[in-house]
Structure formats: structure tokens, C-alpha cells
A protein has these predicted regions:
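C-terminal nuclease/phosphodiesterase catalytic domains that cleave nucleic-acid phosphodiester bonds
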Residues: 138-300
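Short, well-ordered loop/turn elements at secondary-structure boundaries
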Residues: 59-64, 71-76, 85-86, 121-129, ...
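A contiguous, basic/glycine-rich beta-loop/short-helix subdomain that forms a polymer-engagement track
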Residues: 1-66, 79
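Metal-dependent catalytic core segments for phosphate chemistry
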Residues: 18-23, 31-40, 71-113
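Acidic, Ser/Thr-rich low-complexity intrinsically disordered segments
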Residues: 296-311
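A residue-level signal for conserved active-site and pocket-lining positions in enzyme catalytic cores
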Residues: 29, 131, 260
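Short, basic/hydrophobic alpha-helical segments
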Residues: 101-130, 146-147
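Short His-Asn-centered micro-motif
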Residues: 69-71, 129-136, 158-159
Length: 311
């Protein structure tokens, strides 16, 4: 309804006395959406304090690699995360592929990134087991075709669902009309989980800690830029049409690193839910595999080498 500027000023002064009155003023008098921060914004220095020195590209406790790919109009950004028992997380790699997303040359470089091999601390090589690739902002068909190229279970196209309470990831039981499994990622739920883990106090690098998040002492992979992107968002209450809604808002700050972490975490969760991945069992299996004598060592032992092994 029509009102004078003088009345608006009086309404504003009255509203300042009461937070609920302020919400009403913004929603009704100004006709705008009221937003209120629910918690303190996480400082990026909290993440810089979690930097540790890796002994190899993939630290010893890591048993599973996933990746998240964020799609932009002029580039793709991919972050590779390693997972240890208890969902202890280690950032392993960051790859930025510049170029038009619909050009084959650009996509071939993404292919190479997806198939990149990483040296584990035990000397073996690891590849990325599962990828969640964002379909937002570009033609989804681009991601669909790459999913079919790399394997529809290995590379999963995803779309975000900014609805509080949604599962971290929901994978359909059947393929869509394009022949792929288009998964829905509960971005708000994932961010709530991950922010709680990022906020936790750092622990010593040699101490296995469930839910800990660790970053490499390598500025090519992790620096203040990536740390700031990871903490770019904050949880706010948004009042719309008389109803309160919780959501994560980046306030127009860059947040690609966070989006990629969300997708990489979703790739881990779907591996647990759909394929019964057990990180603890996998760790035990890897340990048994690395301590098992090789055929050469067994042959040396049988031939009577010194201490059971030949020189």
C-alpha cells in the first residue's frame, strides 16, 4: 500500500527495537526478502591450520579416491579427495581445465584428469573410483555423454537440490531417457555435515581421526584461495512469504572448491549406499595385500635365500 517516506522512517525506527519487527518491516514495507545469519561465518584460517605434509601424493591411510567436477561456462574445476576409515578426508589434487565446455579438446583434457593415476604412500598406484559431475550451468548432454564414455556407474551426472533435509545423494534405480543415472545431491545437507567437520579442531597428521579434513602442504593444490572458497558460504534464515527457510548463501563469493567437495563427498556416500563400500574393510584388505610376499620373494624363500629372501 502507498505510504510516505516519513512513515517509512518511523516504521524503521520502531522495527529496530525488535528483530521480529525488523523482519516484518523488510518483508512488508520494503517488499524484500529478510535474511539472517544463523551461525558465525567460518574463518578460512581454520582450514589453513589443517595443512599437513603428505609423504606421497596419496597419504598412507587413504583407501578410496573420489572426485567432484564443477561445470562453468569457460572451464571445469575438479578436486580429488582421498578417504580413510571413519571418513577421514585428504585433499589429493586440484585440476582446472580451461576452455569451452562443449569443445571436444576441453573434454579430452577432462577425460585425462578423470583417468589420472596417483602414487600411494605404499608405492602402488590409485585411480579415481567414482566421480560426481555437475550438470548445472551447461548442457547436461555433455556430462551424460562422458558418463557413458567412462562408465555410467563411475561418472555420475548430478544436479543440486537446495532443500534442507534432503539426503546427501539420491541415485535413481533406473537410467533416464538419455541412458544415465542423473543423481540428486542434497547440497544443503552435505554442506551442513562438511562445515561441521571443517570447523573441528585440527589433530596431528599421524593420528587417524574420524571425520577429520586434511589439506596438503602444496600451494599448487591448496592455498588461501581454496580455503576461502571452502568457507565462502554461511547458513542464513530467509523469510519468504511468511515462511522461514534455511539455506546456504555464498553472498556472491567464489565457492567452486566447496561445490567440488560436496560432489566428491556425494560420490563417497553413493558408493557406501549403492555398492556397500566399507572403508575399514577396504583398509584391512589393502594392508593384507601390501604385506603379502610377492612371487619373487616366495621363490627366493623356497630356494633358501638369506633370512628366507635372496640378496
Amino acid at each position: 500500500p502507498f505510504t510516505t517516506w516519513v512513515q517509512i522512517v518511523y516504521d524503521w525506527l520502531d522495527a529496530l527495537k525488535d528483530p521480529n519487527g525488523l523482519k516484518t518491516f523488510v518483508n512488508t514495507t520494503l517488499g524484500e526478502t529478510w535474511e539472517e545469519a544463523v551461525g558465525e561465518k567460518l574463518d578460512h584460517q581454520v582450514l589453513m591450520d589443517k595443512v599437513v605434509r603428505y609423504t606421497a601424493a596419496v597419504p598412507s591411510r587413504v583407501v578410496y579416491l573420489t572426485a567432484g567436477i564443477d561445470s562453468q561456462r569457460n572451464r571445469f574445476e575438479m578436486y580429488v579427495w582421498g578417504w580413510a576409515p571413519g571418513e577421514e578426508a585428504f585433499l589429493v589434487d586440484k585440476i582446472i581445465i580451461m576452455g569451452r565446455p562443449d569443445e571436444e579438446g576441453t573434454l579430452l583434457r577432462v577425460d585425462a584428469a578423470i583417468n589420472k593415476k596417483y602414487r600411494h604412500a605404499d608405492g602402488t598406484e590409485m585411480t579415481i573410483s567414482r566421480v560426481c559431475w555437475d550438470t548445472g550451468g551447461i548442457d547436461g548432454e555433455i556430462v551424460y555423454q562422458r558418463s557413458k564414455k567412462h562408465g555410467v556407474f563411475r561418472v555420475l551426472p548430478v544436479k543440486g537440490a537446495s532443500v534442507y533435509g534432503k539426503p546427501v545423494i539420491t541415485m535413481p534405480k533406473t537410467r533416464n531417457q538419455r541412458g544415465v543415472y542423473l543423481c540428486e545431491v542434497g547440497t544443503d545437507t552435505a554442506k551442513e555435515i562438511l562445515y561441521a567437520r571443517m570447523k573441528a579442531d585440527p589433530t596431528p597428521a599421524d593420528e587417524a581421526t574420524s571425520y577429520a579434513i586434511r589439506f596438503p602442504d602444496d600451494p599448487e593444490i591448496f592455498s588461501q584461495t581454496e580455503a576461502q572458497q571452502l568457507v565462502a558460504e554461511e547458513l542464513v534464515e530467509k523469510w519468504e512469504k511468511g515462511k522461514m527457510r534455511l539455506l546456504w548463501d555464498n553472498k556472491k563469493r567464489r565457492n567452486e572448491a566447496l561445490d567440488c567437495l560436496v560432489y566428491a563427498y556425494a560420490a563417497l556416500r553413493v558408493s557406501v549406499q549403492r555398492w556397500q563400500l566399507d572403508l575399514a574393510v577396504l583398509a584391512k584388505s589393502r594392508e593384507e595385500e601390501t604385506t603379502r610376499p610377492t612371487l619373487k620373494e616366495l621363490a627366493a624363500k623356497l630356494s633358501g635365500g638369506v633370512n628366507g629372501y635372496s640378496r
